[in-house]
Amino acid sequence: MDIKNKNLTELNELCKQIRERILEVVSQNGGHLSSNMGAVELIVAMHYVFDPDSDPFIFDVSHQSYAHKLLTGRWDEFSSLRQLGGISGYTKPKESKFDYFVAGHSSTSISLAVGAAKAIKLKGENRIPVALIGDGAMSAGMAYEAMNELGERKYPCIIILNDNEMSISRPIGAISKYLSQMMAGEFYQKFKGRVNQLLSYIPDGAAYMAKRFEEGFRLITPGMLFEELGLEYIGPVNGHDLADLISAFKVAKSMKKPVIVHTQTIKGKGYEKAEGFDEHWHGVGPFDLQSGEPKKHAKRSATQIYSEALLNLAAKHKNVVGVTAAMPTGTGMDKLIEAFPERFWDVAIAEQHAVTSMAAMAKEGFKPYITIYSTFMQRAYDQVIHDLAIMNLSAVIAMDRAGIVGEDGETHEGCFDISFLNAIPNVSMCAPRDEQSFKDMIEYSYVHEGLLAIRYPRGSFILHEQFKDAPKISRGKSVLLRENKNAKTALIGYGNGVGRAYEVSIKLDFETDLIDLVFAKPLDKEFLINLAKKDKIWYIFSDSVKKGGIGDILSAFLQENKIYDVEINTFEYDDKFLPHGKTPDVEYFLGLDIDSLAKKILNDKKY
C-alpha cells in the first residue's frame, strides 16, 4: 500500500482502519493484541518516511508487526492470522518480501540492523536499516552488545524504541519535557551539529568547560545512556502523534548516523479494555469484542498445576527459590512472586543471567526452580552446561510450553529440549503425564540431587484421572500403566505423549502394553531390558524432534545393551520446522492425530 501521498488526515483515518482490522481478526483468531494496537502510528510513520521496498524493516520479536503486514498487501489474507496455512503472527520472509527476517525471540533486531548496515556499506548502496524494538526487549544484554558496536562503527541506522510502559525513563518535570521536545526538532539537531563544529575553534579551557556543560545537560535528559554508547538520541516522542513521528523520523534519516528515536506509546491504544499495563491483553485467545471476555474457558492447564504445586512446596521449605525471565504470568510464577517476593524473581529478558544467578543460589544451599519456556531455554544453553552441570548443582529447570505450541509457530515450538539437554552430563530429565504425576514430580524434585529438567505442555494434559493410582515418582523409574499379557507390542509415552499413547491404545482395543517412560535420563535399565524380552515392537509417543529425541535415546539404549531384536517406531517430529496453527490442526497436518496414529499401527499388521 502506497501511503506517501496521503495527508495527515488521511493517515490518521488509515490508523483507525488498521486498528479496527486488528481488533476484528484478533478477537476471532487470538493473537498479540495490546502491542499491535499501540504500535499502529509508529508503523504507519515508518512506511511514510522510509522505503519498505529497499530499507530493511526489522521488527524485534515481531509480535507488533500486524500493521506492517496490513500495509504490505496482506489486508484480505489477514483474516487467516495464526491459522494453519495462513498469515503468521510474526514476520516471515517466506510470506512476504517486506518481512526482512524471521523473528519471535527477543532482542535480535539491533544486531540484525548492524549486520544489514555493514552489508549495505560494503555494497555501496543508499539504504538504511530501520529496527523497531520495545522497551522490554531492551532489558536483554544482546541489545546492548549490538548498540556497543554500532556506537563505535557509526553505521547509518535507525533504532525506533517503542517504550510502551515507560520503564526506561520518564520525563522529569517541565524542564525535561521541554528539552525532549526541543531534541526532537530539526532545528535542535542542526544547532547541535553547528555548536560542535564551533567548539573545535574555542581555546582548550573553554572547550573543556563547554564539554562539561554538555555532559551536565545530558544528565537530565532521557538520552544520556544512548549518547554515552555513541548513538544520537531523539525523543521522547509521542508515539501516537503522526506529525511528531514523521518529523522525528525525517530528522533521524537525514543524520546519516546511528540514531535512537525514543517513542512513548500506550499498549492496547484504541481498545479501552486493553489500554494500559494489563498483561492479560498481550497475547489473547478469541474474545468477545463488546465484553472483552474470552470465547472459550480453557481447561486446567499444566502451568496452573505447576504454579500451585510450587507454591505449596515453597510454603513448606524456606530454601525454595525461583526465577523466570519476563514471563511471570505465562509461567505461573506471578503467584510465587506475589506470595514470596523475597525468594522469587522476574529478571526480565535475561535467560542467561537467570540460570547463572540461580547456580550461585544452589551453591549457597538453596533449591532453585528456573521456570522458562522450552523455546527460551535455548538461549541459556551455555549457562546450563558451564554454571549448573559442570558444578553438579541441585536445581530444577521447569520448561513450560514443551512440544507443539500452536499458533505461535516455528520460533516458539518447544521440541528441542530433550535433544540438547540429553547430551549434557549430570542432567536428569523427566516429564509428567497428568496432573497427579506432575504434583508428585514437583514433590520429588525437591529431594532430587543434581540438576533435574522437567518439561510440560502448553494448555492441559490429555490424561486426567485414568491412572491416579499409579506408583509415585521415583528416580529413573518407568511405570507400566496397562499390561496385556498376550501382547508383543508396547506403546511407550513420554510426558503428554502418554496421553496420546493411551488414546491410541483404546483404538487398538488395549491389545498392547502401555508404558510411561517418566524419565528420559536416567533410563530405567532393568525395566526396559525386561520389556524387550516380552515386547518386540515399540511405538514411541513424545512431543519432541526425532533427532536426539526419545526414539533415538531408546534405540541407543538397546544398542548399548546388545538388544537387536526389538523394532522401534517413533511418532516424533521430522527434521523440519513446524508450521503455525491450532495444535489439533498441526497434529493432523503432521499425521500425529489419534486416528492417524492408530491407523499407522493397524496398517503395520505387526502388533
Curated annotation (Swiss-Prot):
Binds 1 Mg(2+) ion per subunit. SMART domains: Transket_pyr (SM00861). Its EC number is 2.2.1.7. Keywords: Isoprene biosynthesis, Magnesium, Metal-binding, Thiamine biosynthesis, Thiamine pyrophosphate, Transferase. Its cofactor is Mg(2+); thiamine diphosphate. GO terms for cellular component: cytosol. GO terms for biological process: 1-deoxy-D-xylulose 5-phosphate biosynthetic process; isopentenyl diphosphate biosynthetic process, methylerythritol 4-phosphate pathway; terpenoid biosynthetic process; thiamine biosynthetic process. Mg(2+) binds at D135, N164. GO terms for molecular function: 1-deoxy-D-xylulose-5-phosphate synthase activity; magnesium ion binding; thiamine pyrophosphate binding. The keyword Hydrolase does not apply. Pathway: Metabolic intermediate biosynthesis; 1-deoxy-D-xylulose 5-phosphate biosynthesis; 1-deoxy-D-xylulose 5-phosphate from D-glyceraldehyde 3-phosphate and pyruvate: step 1/1. Catalyzes the acyloin condensation reaction between C atoms 2 and 3 of pyruvate and glyceraldehyde 3-phosphate to yield 1-deoxy-D-xylulose-5-phosphate (DXP). Belongs to the transketolase family. DXPS subfamily. Homodimer. This is 1-deoxy-D-xylulose-5-phosphate synthase. It comes from Campylobacter hominis (strain ATCC BAA-381 / DSM 21671 / CCUG 45161 / LMG 19568 / NCTC 13146 / CH001A).
